[in-house]
């Protein structure tokens, strides 16, 4: 769980900014979206393979440029 203590003489805006940063780094939203609905393992594997192919293709294009 992400928690932030407000420091002395710190504005609410700065505290919220620190909270948002910790929230993103902890991967709370990413985990929520991943677990929002059930995905069959076969479909999950297929998506992982296609993401991997795209990533490899982009890396290959960058090397050739």
Swiss-Prot record:
Keyword field: Ribonucleoprotein, Ribosomal protein
InterPro entries attached to this UniProt entry: Ribosomal_bS21 (IPR001911), Ribosomal_bS21_sf (IPR038380)
A single Gene Ontology CC term: ribosome
Highest taxon above the source species: Bacteria
Annotated source species: Chlorobium chlorochromatii (strain CaD3)
GO BP annotations, alphabetical order: translation
Protein name from the UniProt record: Small ribosomal subunit protein bS21
GO MF: structural constituent of ribosome
Pfam families xrefs: Ribosomal_S21
NCBIfam families (UniProt xref): S21p
Family named by the database record: Belongs to the bacterial ribosomal protein bS21 family.
């Amino acid at each position: 769980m992400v928690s932030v203590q407000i420091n002395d003489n710190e504005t609410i805006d700065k505290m919220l900014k620190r909270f948002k940063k910790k929230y993103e780094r902890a991967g709370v939203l990413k985990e929520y979206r991943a677990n929002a609905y059930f995905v069959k393992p076969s479909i999950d594997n297929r998506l992982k393979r296609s993401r991997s192919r795209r990533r490899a293709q982009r890396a290959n294009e960058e090397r050739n440029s």
